[in-house]
Amino acid sequence: REGEVYGIAGESGCGKSTLLRVLMAAHQPPLTVVEGSVKYVFGNSTVDALNMSEQEIRDLRWKEVSYVPQGSMHVLNPVRRIRDQFQDFIRSHRQVSKREATEMTSKYLTELGLPDSVMNAYPHQLSGGMRQRVTIALATILWPKLIFVDEPTTALDVVVQRGVIQLLKDIREQEGS
């Protein structure tokens, strides 16, 4: 249901991250789904993520359903500025100019309380907590209806953990995800 938050708890290695990859239709061999389905209902439309083409899955991801993987702060390209990574991401899903993508990014990062200086930084110039917040912003900038987040505070100190959790709460309030 819209605006609700759920948690999945379990011992290390019990399959929590694997479950999230299946829910995102992002599983890869040798992992296979023997039977069942992953159905999403958006308005009057129902889709089964396990029976979609690659293009349909690509269209679903990030616009409708988003995923922040475990250790996500390492998914940023180390040799590209944050601004460029946002531009590429937005432009791969929306028909906008680089300038429009940059403006959209700047506005969104500001709304999330991230400083403008982040835009021109390389990932290694940011703290672990800031990289995590940037990654969450990247996963949510297209306003997905559903967001999966896998251990968003791993390897962060307590103060930074609190900031990341608050960021996720703020996104939920702003977007209704």
Predicted regions: what they are:
Residues 122-126, 130:
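Conserved ABC ATPase signature
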Residues 9-11:
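The feature captures the beta-strand-to-loop junction immediately N-terminal to the Walker
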Residues 44-66, 84, 92:
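ABC ATPase NBD coupling module
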Residues 41, 99-117, 169:
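Conserved ABC ATPase "signature" region
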Residues 162-176:
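Helical segment within the ABC ATPase nucleotide-binding domain
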Residues 147-150:
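Catalytic Walker B motif of ABC-type/P-loop ATPase nucleotide-binding domains
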Residues 141-145:
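A short, proline-enriched helix->beta-strand linker immediately N-terminal to the Walker B motif
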